[in-house]
Amino acid sequence: MAKQKIRIKLKGFDHKILDQSALQIVEALERTGATISGPVPLPTRIQRYSVIRASFIDKDSQEQFEIRTHKRLIDIVETTSKTIDALTNLNLPAGVSIDIKL
């Protein structure tokens, strides 16, 4: 294949599953002979929500929740002909979102 840079972004709420998926992708790419950089941990996005516990009164009693979105970045610098085939045949867990840009 020609010189083509592929960027893979992984997102998920559980950092352990995200790291396992990134390791699985890196191992599959190394088997094909592709040159990669990463996985690079990107900043975690934290969304915080405050909910009033009582239904009618007592604003002083609130409960806080947060959602943490963890992100990883993998760059494929040099690809081979088997690289894209290896990426399409991967089985990733349900809690991981993957974005591939060419």
UniProtKB/Swiss-Prot annotation:
Keywords: Ribonucleoprotein, Ribosomal protein
Top-level lineage group: Bacteria
Entries under Pfam families matching the protein: Ribosomal_S10
GO MF, one annotated term: structural constituent of ribosome
Subunit structure: Part of the 30S ribosomal subunit.
PANTHER family per record: 30S RIBOSOMAL PROTEIN S10 FAMILY MEMBER
The name this protein goes by in its record: Small ribosomal subunit protein uS10
